[in-house]
């Protein structure tokens, strides 16, 4: 039960996350670098947690600060707006991706970790390792932004460290042991339409368009293999659904090592995120509810899977 006492709320929230005896104290000693007695004085409420300590605990356990200060989801929730800065888009985009990669990669293995995505565009976790497809998403955003001079796709030079962090972003999903993808049935068509438009106004050359087309065929092959196996190369389970209705946006949730993160994709490559528990539960429930409109094509649903990827290759071939 939340009170008007932020310190008491923090203690209660920590005990909800780590209910086993001794587990919470050990975590606090490791995170705050303080002794056992100092930890127990704080847990008894004799000494309040400092703001810096609260922030460290919040990040470690995925406890939202609004919960600590007693705000409810109905009145307020805190979001992190991850918007690429047009003054230095490459560095800004790199920092956003690196933040997620570092956060997930530094966590201990969690066999109960899960991720779910309902997507109307191909998810970043699937396409970012393909350099031209990753470059196209960034190019589209930069061209749309009036503050950035971006004249053609070929002229856009992506820094090597950004290319590498994009691949690391895809690789970090090896830490997620169960993944649900629910795809809009227009997921490839949307991308093809965008590429075709930029090619029609001569911002993408015919030669480059063919190279992008080859990457799309490769991606389709990878996704079909993923659907057939129902698991990644690391052995993590993947369920892929194709929706019979279209989605307005791309939503995702991640639950790993007591970190509950919700993401809403905006402005092509950007997202807003929150660690608010109630928003996480609501978003997860919403994403899972979309399965009732969808067909499972991983492991089972062989005929539907064959038909879906046949259609995607026909769409790609028309580029």
Short names for language-model regions:
Residues 1-6, 35-40, 126-137, 150-166:
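Charged, low-complexity, helix/coiled-coil-prone segments
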Residues 1-84:
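Basic, Lys/Arg-rich alpha-helical nucleic-acid-recognition elements, primarily the DNA-binding modules
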Residues 4, 18, 90, 206-213:
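Generic detection of long, well-ordered alpha-helical segments
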Residues 9, 27, 38, 89-99, ...:
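Exposed alpha-helical structural elements
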Residues 17, 21, 104-107, 111, ...:
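Short secondary-structure junctions and interdomain/linker hinges
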Residues 74-151:
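Helix-turn-helix/homeodomain-like alpha-helical modules used for DNA recognition
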Residues 139-309:
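Hydrophobic protein-protein interaction segments
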């Amino acid at each position: 039960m939340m009170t008007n006492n932020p310190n008491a709320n923090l203690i209660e929230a920590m005990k909800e996350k780590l209910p086993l005896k001794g587990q919470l104290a050990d975590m606090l000693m490791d995170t705050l670098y303080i002794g056992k007695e100092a930890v127990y004085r704080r847990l008894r409420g004799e000494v309040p947690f400092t703001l810096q300590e609260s922030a460290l605990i919040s990040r470690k356990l995925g406890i939202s600060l609004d919960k600590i200060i007693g705000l409810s989801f109905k009145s307020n929730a805190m979001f992190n707006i991850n918007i690429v800065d047009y003054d230095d888009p490459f560095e800004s985009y790199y920092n956003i991706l690196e933040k997620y990669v570092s956060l997930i990669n530094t966590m201990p293995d969690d066999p109960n970790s899960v991720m779910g995505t309902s997507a109307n565009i191909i998810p970043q976790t699937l396409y970012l390792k393909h350099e031209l497809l990753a470059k196209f998403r960034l190019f589209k955003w930069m061209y749309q932004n009036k503050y950035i001079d971006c004249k053609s796709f070929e002229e856009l030079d992506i820094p090597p460290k950004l290319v590498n962090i994009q691949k690391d972003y895809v690789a970090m999903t090896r830490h997620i042991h169960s993944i649900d993808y629910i795809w809009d049935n227009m997921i490839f068509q949307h991308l093809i339409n965008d590429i075709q438009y930029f090619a029609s106004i001569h911002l993408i050359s015919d030669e480059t368009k063919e190279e992008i087309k080859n990457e799309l065929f490769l991606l389709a092959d990878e996704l079909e293999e993923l659907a057939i196996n129902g698991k990644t190369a690391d052995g993590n389970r993947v369920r892929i659904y194709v929706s019979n209705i279209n989605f307005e946006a791309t939503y995702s949730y991640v639950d790993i090592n007591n970190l509950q993160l919700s993401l809403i994709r905006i402005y092509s490559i950007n997202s807003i995120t929150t660690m608010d528990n109630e928003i996480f539960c609501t978003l997860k429930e919403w994403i899972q509810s979309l399965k009732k409109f969808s067909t499972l094509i991983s492991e089972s649903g062989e005929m539907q899977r064959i038909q879906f990827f046949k259609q995607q290759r026909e769409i790609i071939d028309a580029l």
